[in-house]
Amino acid sequence: MASKVFFGSARQARLEAKETLPAKLDLIIDQLHIRDRVKGETVVIKMHTGNNMSYSTIHPVFVRRVVQAVKDGGGKPFVVGVNWNTAGAEQRGYSSETIGCPVYPAAGPEEKYFYEHERPFKNIKSWKVAGLIQDST
């Protein structure tokens, strides 16, 4: 079965607010019924917040839209990334003030908070899952 793909074109047919990318993201969020799925849940939003000079990240205005949808649905969102990306996330616009929730390293500040799972696959004997990701509901 093919996956459903959601797409919002950057093209604006008219100079109206509803034609902007943030407004199109709001329509996708509505179609995904995010608000209906998160009540009372701790919701991790995993993303790449950039590293040093990185600029190919999702703009904070879009992240805030997703965060706000989770909050509107009664969820408790937070953003995670790897330690070396989240350390300077505020300098790239990813802060509690701009996106509406905290940004944490997924496996803790020292990258030592994880759960190991024994699930052999080919030459891999175990998998390590970042603690904050596994702990989210």
Predicted regions and their residues:
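N-terminal and secondary-structure boundary signal
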Residues: 1-137
